[in-house]
């Protein structure tokens, strides 16, 4: 049986990891052993933060909608309640965008929500 030498595979594996670690500080981008740990940890952070990003953006949208609603004399929760009662189904991302860039349209939405609450 022929002897199996794994130099080629090891070299490929090392290159793949070091390529992913490019731009890391110090030994993290140069030493394979350290780079493996850095790349693994980076993957864990990326996985976690892809989920956290959704929460973060939702919080941002709510803050923006709340600010716009309060400028028109309504709290966020009452505004959302009024929108649901008026059967206006616009998601928070779009509402936040309208609140930021189109004040007149947002004011009209707030007025419709107020009318439903009254």
Curated annotation (Swiss-Prot):
Pfam families: Ribosomal_L20. It comes from the Bacteria. PANTHER family: 39S RIBOSOMAL PROTEIN L20 (PTHR10986). GO terms for molecular function: rRNA binding; structural constituent of ribosome. Keywords: Ribonucleoprotein, Ribosomal protein, RNA-binding, rRNA-binding. Binds directly to 23S ribosomal RNA and is necessary for the in vitro assembly process of the 50S ribosomal subunit. It is not involved in the protein synthesizing functions of that subunit. PROSITE patterns: RIBOSOMAL_L20. SUPFAM superfamilies: Ribosomal protein L20. Belongs to the bacterial ribosomal protein bL20 family. One of its GO terms (cellular component) is ribosome. The keyword Flavoprotein does not apply. This is Large ribosomal subunit protein bL20.
